[in-house]
Amino acid sequence: MPYTTEEIVEPFWAEFSSAASGRDPLAIQNSSVVIYTKMVVGITNVTNRIRYNGFYCWIFDTILQSITKKNSLQEQIRYSRRAELLLAYLMVKNFEGITGVSGSAYAAKNLSPTISLKHGADWESKKENGPGLYWKFKLGVFGQYYSGVVRDLNLINHPNAQVDLNIYTLTEKGKELAKSFEENIPKEERDLFWSSVYNGKIKESDLAKLKSFALHVIPKGSSERSIYEKALLAADNKKAEPSFNRRETIKLILSHLNEHNESVENLVSSFLRANYRSHQKEVV
């Protein structure tokens, strides 16, 4: 006999109704989240491509310069969602097998001669007949995965009602990154990308013209690459006595790879095992 949650107040095991990633009902992941949040500030288990940070700085700057409703969060998110979807499409089309691209599963299933970014990304389209939206969270990939990260890295300010600021804005550091990102994208590609986002559609054949937006390729020697490196090696916070846990963690990983380059098959397991053994020796 089925019961409802209103009828039973004690904890009970129930059938899992649907598959969904990210759920942690017993808070088993809490300790891990606390540890990596402290050890690698600005990096999480879902921020798999650091170039997303530069992309978001650039697209928010472009949106602000290009639309008439400057202080509208709804408009800002409308175009940032379309931009995320377009980025997923161009990655799937041009760089098969590259991981860490949010929305890529949707993009792979919905490639067509004429691609509607509007129907695939706009929140208003979720009730219309069709393949659905590329991302269920209203603020998109940015809101779910990267908004906290770019704030921790001092790149993007969050909306603040106290100062009548309804949108995400760039810090000076974010503006610098947006400019550096833009320098690595030819003007014709930037224009095509934005016009496609603004109009809500693009031809599949035009995706090949947007390869400079590749998330896995950051030109060597570029100021964009330098900003990422400095951000990762900088202090974790602005306290009087700042911590450098992220920098020290990166050093440990690089040292481990340098020492065990040929034998490392699973970096995470190998790295944790080696450091655990090292800690045991120190304790003894």
Q: Can you describe what each PLM-predicted range is?
A:
Residues 1-284:
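Non-catalytic recognition/regulatory regions in large multidomain proteins
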